[in-house]
Amino acid sequence: MAFKYQLLLSAAVMLAILVATATSFGDSCAPGDALPHNPLRACRTYVVSQICHQGPRLLTSDMKRRCCDELSAIPAYCRCEALRIIMQGVVTWQGAFEGAYFKDSPNCPRERQTSYAANLVTPQECNLGTIHGSAYCPELQPGYGVVL
């Protein structure tokens, strides 16, 4: 009788592991999965225009709206990761490096660009929810272990 319950429990545990594994692959916040390759182009343009005062001659409100629209199209659980990718980059499962789009320039340090990008989900910018349940990506803030 005990063997029967052990077998049933083992089967239930294996099924739970299988389900968890299957769902985690579909929810991967990687370029080509839940994120597009080369994500957040409008946001990169918006950040550079705000911090470096370079880029297209568009109204700031138009650039911000495009960025927020682009960021809102990304699942909430991947928004912080999408911002991290444009700031620091990532090696995809195919082995290709993507991201780290902000570059140092004499009048526009990369640190200022990445700091601004980290705040795009906040209420002052796009006010979008994240995996943290609020408009905040704490792991992207200086001092949280992020190398800028």
UniProtKB/Swiss-Prot annotation:
InterPro entries: Allergen/soft/tryp_amyl_inhib, Allergen/tryp_amyl_inhib_CS, Bifun_inhib/LTP/seed_sf, Bifunc_inhib/LTP/seed_store. Expressed in the developing endosperm. Not detected in embryo, aleurone, coleoptile, roots and leaves. Residues 1-24 form the signal peptide. It is found in: Secreted. The record marks 57 as: Interaction with trypsin. GO terms for biological process: defense response. Keywords: Disulfide bond, Protease inhibitor, Secreted, Serine protease inhibitor, Signal. GO terms for cellular component: extracellular region. SMART domains: AAI (SM00499). Five disulfide bonds, which are essential for the inhibitor activity, are probably present. GO terms for molecular function: serine-type endopeptidase inhibitor activity. The sequence heterogeneity suggests that more than one gene exists for this inhibitor. The genes may be alleles, or multiple loci could exist. Belongs to the protease inhibitor I6 (cereal trypsin/alpha-amylase inhibitor) family. Inhibits trypsin in vitro. Probably plays a protective role through inhibition of insect midgut proteases. This is Trypsin inhibitor CMe.
